[in-house]
Amino acid sequence: MKSIVKKCSVAAVLALAALMPDFRLLNTSPGGLALIADLEGCRLTPYQCSAGVWTSGIGHTAGVVPKGEITERQAAANLVADVLNVEKRLAVCAPVKMPQQVYDALVSFSFNVGTGAACRSTLVSFIKRQRWPQACDQLIRWV
């Protein structure tokens, strides 16, 4: 039996995210959130990502089970919580001041590959030394 995949509007989820109480705690810019959302896409029904992990909303994996559907509001709340979690972990492994665009790209990268892999990466080692062009060049190695 074929299941129906229910997608959601990235724009609607981002608008709802801006209304979440913890939104003001984010260091990622609205453009950075849009980057994450555009790259991840949005689905209200759970699906298995390319790594075989159950996922819903905008790249949310914690506690996702094969059955059950979420709302766009839940997707927005999960996005804000997930990005805050990524930011918290990056503050430990890459505690350097960086341009906003570099920060947004780092958060997006870490959101996708996981903070463990990101923090062990050559990309982060370049960021720690504030070598932005070399850090940027590392992104291609992960595609």
Would you name each region that the model predicts?
Residues 1-143:
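Cell-wall polysaccharide-cleaving catalytic domain and substrate-binding groove, primarily
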